[in-house]
Swiss-Prot record:
Its main location: mitochondrion. The keyword Transmembrane helix applies. GO terms for molecular function: ATPase activator activity. Residues 1-3 are mitochondrial intermembrane. Residues 25-112 are mitochondrial matrix. The keyword Secreted does not apply. It comes from the Eukaryota. The gene is dnj-21. This is Mitochondrial import inner membrane translocase subunit TIM14. Belongs to the TIM14 family. Probable component of the PAM complex at least composed of a mitochondrial HSP70 protein, GrpE, tim-44, tim-16 and tim-14/dnj-21. The chain crosses the membrane at residues 4-24. SUPFAM superfamilies: Chaperone J-domain (SSF46565).
C-alpha cells in the first residue's frame, strides 16, 4: 500500500517538474520546434497522385524508376526488379503488376 503511494507521489512530482520546465523554457522549446523541418521527411521523394487514365511515358518511367530516355536494357532490368517485389504470386497486387507491365510495354514500344 505505501509502495503505491510513494510511486504515485514520485509520478506527480515528475509531472510537476516537467510542467515547470516546459513553462520556464517555452521560448526555447518553440524556437527548437520551428527549426524542425515539417515538410519532407521520409516520404518527400515519393510521387503524390494516382494513375492517369491513359499512361504517359513520364508516368511509365516513374513506375519503373528509370529516366524517360532509358535504354531498353535498363528498362528490362528495372521491370524485373519491380516485378520481383510486386508479383501477385508473392503477395503483390494484380493491379500493380498490370500497371508495371503496361509501363514496360509503353516504354519499350515508344523506344522503337
Amino acid at each position: 500500500m505505501t509502495g503505491g503511494l510513494i510511486v504515485a507521489g514520485l509520478g506527480l512530482a515528475a509531472v510537476g517538474f516537467g510542467a515547470r520546465y516546459v513553462l520556464r523554457n517555452q521560448a526555447l522549446i518553440k524556437k527548437g520546434m520551428e527549426a524542425i523541418p515539417v515538410a519532407g521527411g521520409a516520404f518527400s521523394n515519393y510521387y503524390r497522385g494516382g494513375f492517369d487514365q491513359k499512361m504517359s511515358r513520364a508516368e511509365a518511367a516513374k513506375i519503373l524508376g528509370v529516366a524517360p530516355s532509358a535504354k531498353p536494357a535498363k528498362i528490362k532490368e528495372a521491370h524485373k526488379k519491380v516485378m520481383i517485389v510486386n508479383h501477385p504470386d508473392r503477395g503483390g497486387s494484380p493491379y500493380l503488376a498490370a500497371k508495371i507491365n503496361e509501363a514496360k510495354d509503353l516504354m519499350e514500344s515508344s523506344k522503337s
